[in-house]
Amino acid sequence: MRSAVVVALLVMVAMSLQLTAAQEDLKYFEREVVAELAAQILRVAQGPSAFVAGPHKRNSELINSLLGIPKVMNDAGRR
């Protein structure tokens, strides 16, 4: 289903580009917007792995790491 939506969006973008290319007055800003939309469509088509920066941490791991910061700083001050 998602791939069908992506293909439909790509077809619409291609058709709109053909219409605007006929006019030959795409401004720099419009080209930038089209490029950004195409990049977003590709990121969505690649799936959730495109949005992940690194390994997932559980909420408890995040909380423990945040709560452990003062202890680490306190231990560093004793040295």
From Swiss-Prot:
InterPro entries, sorted: Pigment_DH
GO terms for biological process, alphabetical: chemical synaptic transmission; response to light stimulus
Recorded superkingdom: Eukaryota
Location of this chain's protein in the cell: Secreted
Keyword Secreted: yes
GO cellular component: extracellular region; synapse
Protein name: Pigment-dispersing hormone type 1
